[in-house]
Amino acid sequence: MPLEMEPKMSKLAFGCQRSSTSDDDSGCALEEYAWVPPGLRPEQIQLYFACLPEEKVPYVNSPGEKHRIKQLLYQLPPHDNEVRYCQSLSEEEKKELQVFSAQRKKEALGRGTIKLLSRAVMHAVCEQCGLKINGGEVAVFASRAGPGVCWHPSCFVCFTCNELLVDLIYFYQDGKIHCGRHHAELLKPRCSACDEIIFADECTEAEGRHWHMKHFCCLECETVLGGQRYIMKDGRPFCCGCFESLYAEYCETCGEHIGVDHAQMTYDGQHWHATEACFSCAQCKASLLGCPFLPKQGQIYCSKTCSLGEDVHASDSSDSAFQSARSRDSRRSVRMGKSSRSADQCRQSLLLSPALNYKFPGLSGNADDTLSRKLDDLSLSRQGTSFASEEFWKGRVEQETPEDPEEWADHEDYMTQLLLKFGDKSLFQPQPNEMDIRASEHWISDNMVKSKTELKQNNQSLASKKYQSDMYWAQSQDGLGDSAYGSHPGPASSRRLQELELDHGASGYNHDETQWYEDSLECLSDLKPEQSVRDSMDSLALSNITGASVDGENKPRPSLYSLQNFEEMETEDCEKMSNMGTLNSSMLHRSAESLKSLSSELCPEKILPEEKPVHLPVLRRSKSQSRPQQVKFSDDVIDNGNYDIEIRQPPMSERTRRRVYNFEERGSRSHHHRRRRSRKSRSDNALNLVTERKYSPKDRLRLYTPDNYEKFIQNKSAREIQAYIQNADLYGQYAHATSDYGLQNPGMNRFLGLYGEDDDSWCSSSSSSSDSEEEGYFLGQPIPQPRPQRFAYYTDDLSSPPSALPTPQFGQRTTKSKKKKGHKGKNCIIS
């Protein structure tokens, strides 16, 4: 009996265990999980939770439990169902809420059912993912969706937010299952501020969301923003004032708030106003809007040059090139002769060209442009129009004499050392012999006749020619070389160098017209390589300013001009002139030796009669050139140009003031004795040589038109032309001593009629000019005016200011003397 009862007892015990609610694994499941699906056996519960992500399984005191609570509040907002959870509903709105909640529950609310599919079910498909659900697996069914519709446990999610439906609670709408939140939003808008359903008739819609009218306000000051401007920050609205005070960025340039009304530029966490003033180069202040820029150390620059802190535009202040101190490294590099082609060209253009058109500033594109900017443009124009082929000049190897190492080392003055050490070494070349001179005269005369038509073709107007280089400015900044870093002389220094040239300048007058064009800056790009004229003064002045040798690619080319040049170029257009209003002749051919050698070759036996010096009015400077400039060299250095000439220095009492010279005593001497005189008197030769011969009206120069002169050249042999040159009366033997200024003057014949008639003369330096064309002062004293009944100033008759380029070279001799303060210019105003 006991043996028979054992299986029955065990079966009863098993049945009781299965039917007991406390022992049916449900007790264990309730203790392990915060929530379990109702009506499931323990193994079915295990199968269900096994289908869910581990972090979403609601174990007790687990992240899954916290996630469940969060989802309950989110998916089933209590204020969507209960009036007590709402903040400020009117009575009407409360009734609407109750009706709304009851209707949703009645029409859409449901709970999903977990079922274990029988193995006979072969065609169950998940409604969400569309995959097959095999027999023996658990599936979720929704009664509102229909009996045959099922989902994988992990696919039973809200159609809108794609989150697992917490506790399997769903709302069915239009064939889709939703959580309680998104189902309510399908029916009524939800306020983004209070998260409640909006039952009022009016609401504010912004940013794709809805607000109660009174809830759409600034998050900071709670100002109602309905119908006003606002700014959204992290999904919250702000009024413009609060946003600027809390979140507005500061401009890196001006330091002010970037207002909501202003566009801004942002780069690497930095902000700028999107204006030309703020978003600009930190160095040159050029606007960078729409342009590439170079960021460096929190600043933005337009180019590499500006990022290095250098000013591309030279300063226009007085003597800026000499007042700016150089670093030791730059001095060392200068002494090593480092130089670039573009830098040398830029510096030379600065030395050669004055300020543009002081009488007609309207011709300039921008009247506020600095002088150095325009000078750089001119140098770029030379470079852009192929002034001279590099191979052409490199092929012309010139002999250079070795420098004397002791000459420059004996002086402590830095500028003097640079002048002596890096001066043009070709200056000491011997004078060309007579055969070379005659051959070159014939060659140049033929060449000038051939090139006359070419010059006419290339003769553009002043505005189009002089300013055509502006287009190259932005592209050529990096090509300026040393000149971009401030080592080139400023315009004030250029004026001073022109005054140094002036000291040795002859003041003979050329009655040509084309000489204006040949000597002007505009002609540089038109000249052929064989016509290109370079003065060794360029090298001397470059050495004074930069200390850089210009012997390499910028070697001076000797070029000989005969009188045919001056006579041939008579009737050309005088449109192109610069504004240098003084006799700015070069030092090149002004020594007594070169004049003597020239005169001995052209007219070997003729001795000039002694005549009284002529008294010529001088061109006067403009107001812009009236500031006195001074280059200080060592007072103890005087280079007499390798000639055994006795140099006398004036006493100390006479060095600080300008002196008055009388030329009558010098007019009574033969020019063969002038070699003994000082540097000052040597520059006076040009004045005296022109005046030592008196001409009758019948002996004056016959003027040829271009057509007549070409016929004359064709009909004459070389010797007849040479004889004609020697008999050219106005210039005589000393054509090469004439000034660089050809004067086109309707009153020239009146002047020639009075040639050499005055007895008294006086000379005054014109380094500082008058304040106007009518009266002038120097050092507080009025400059005496020429008698108006005799002749008029030439500048009154000029169509435009005269040019200021050096004369063509004759040999390579020049004088590198350092001028004393008392021996400034020798431009003479003679009454």
UniProtKB/Swiss-Prot annotation:
Signal peptide (UniProt feature, chain positions): none
Effect of S739F: Probable risk factor for NTD
GO cellular component, one term: glutamatergic synapse
Lipid-modified residues, S-farnesyl cysteine kind: C828
Main subcellular location of this protein, as a coarse class: nucleus
UniProt keyword terms in alphabetical order: Cytoplasm, Disease variant, Epilepsy, LIM domain, Lipoprotein, Membrane, Metal-binding, Methylation, Neurodegeneration, Nucleus, Phosphoprotein, Prenylation, Repeat, Zinc
Residue intervals of the PET domain: 14-122
Tissue: Expressed at highest levels in placenta and at lower levels in lung, liver, kidney and pancreas. Expressed in thalamus, hippocampus, cerebral cortex, and cerebellum (in neurons rather than glia).
PROSITE patterns the UniProt entry points to: LIM_DOMAIN_1, LIM_DOMAIN_2, PET
Impact reported for T275M: Probable risk factor for NTD
Quaternary structure note: Interacts with REST.
Disorder: Epilepsy, progressive myoclonic 1B: A form of progressive myoclonic epilepsy, a clinically and genetically heterogeneous group of disorders defined by the combination of action and reflex myoclonus, other types of epileptic seizures, and progressive neurodegeneration and neurocognitive impairment. EPM1B is an autosomal recessive form characterized by myoclonus that progressed in severity over time, tonic-clonic seizures and ataxia. Neural tube defects: Congenital malformations of the central nervous system and adjacent structures related to defective neural tube closure during the first trimester of pregnancy. Failure of neural tube closure can occur at any level of the embryonic axis. Common NTD forms include anencephaly, myelomeningocele and spina bifida, which result from the failure of fusion in the cranial and spinal region of the neural tube. NTDs have a multifactorial etiology encompassing both genetic and environmental components.
Protein name: Prickle-like protein 1
The organism's taxonomic lineage, starting at the top: Eukaryota, Metazoa, Chordata, Craniata, Vertebrata
Protein's gene: PRICKLE1
